[in-house]
């Protein structure tokens, strides 16, 4: 084999090893992002909800700041209920990792009938939240507010 070919092969192997260490985005969170953007007709990226108020994004505490933050609080509670279901009691059936089937048609989100009990429950949590997000006012001042004012979500 030509030395240049060996060098290219080595570079590919090294880059693949590096990429293998990058954790993938949990599939159900990717589903949730798609449902959000379906329900709001693509008017706002799902990332805009990743760190909003006291409950949108990782964790959550305190009093929700507005209707949108209340949507996230309800969604957090729904995931908590999903984790209590016997059908969802192992790691890969966690709401954060369990991918489900859905359809999006002109802003209407539908969880499909081929989901098992756990997937159907998680899909309905995400569907309800996505519809709630689409109907709530987005207050720009509440984006990343917990980082701007760490006393607000006590």
Curated annotation (Swiss-Prot):
Active-site residues from the entry: 75, 126
Tissue expression remark: Expressed by the venom gland.
Signal peptide range in chain numbering: 1-27
EC numbers for this chain: 3.1.1.4
Chief location: secreted
UniProt keyword annotation of Signal present: yes
Keywords per UniProt: Calcium, Disulfide bond, Hydrolase, Lipid degradation, Lipid metabolism, Metal-binding, Secreted, Signal
Short name of any one Pfam family annotated for the protein: Phospholip_A2_1
Binding site for Ca(2+): 57, 59, 76
Reaction equation(s) it catalyzes: a 1,2-diacyl-sn-glycero-3-phosphocholine + H2O = a 1-acyl-sn-glycero-3-phosphocholine + a fatty acid + H(+)
Cofactor note: Binds 1 Ca(2+) ion.
Protein name from the UniProt record: Phospholipase A2 OS1
